[in-house]
UniProtKB/Swiss-Prot annotation:
Keywords assigned: Disulfide bond, Ion channel impairing toxin, Knottin, Neurotoxin, Secreted, Toxin, Voltage-gated sodium channel impairing toxin
UniProt domain comment: The presence of a 'disulfide through disulfide knot' structurally defines this protein as a knottin.
Organism: Pireneitega luctuosa
Function: Binds at site 4 of sodium channels (Nav) and inhibits the fast inactivation of cockroach channels. This toxin is active only on insects. Has a potent activity against S.litura larvae.
Taxon lineage: Eukaryota, Metazoa, Ecdysozoa, Arthropoda, Chelicerata
Cellular localisation: Secreted
Designated name of the protein: Delta-amaurobitoxin-Pl1c
Length: 36
C-alpha cells in the first residue's frame, strides 16, 4: 500500500503517509494514527 487508511498506525516523521486528506494524529507517547 502506498498510503495508510484511517485508524492505521503512522509516523509523522517517516514511512508512508495517510491516504487522501487524512493526517497523522499523535495524541501522546508516540502512538500516531491516521485521522480524517
Amino acid at each position: 500500500a502506498d498510503c495508510l487508511n484511517e485508524g492505521d498506525w503512522c509516523a509523522d516523521w517517516s514511512g508512508p503517509s495517510c491516504c487522501g486528506e487524512m493526517w497523522c494524529s499523535c495524541p501522546g507517547f508516540g502512538k500516531c494514527r491516521c485521522k480524517k
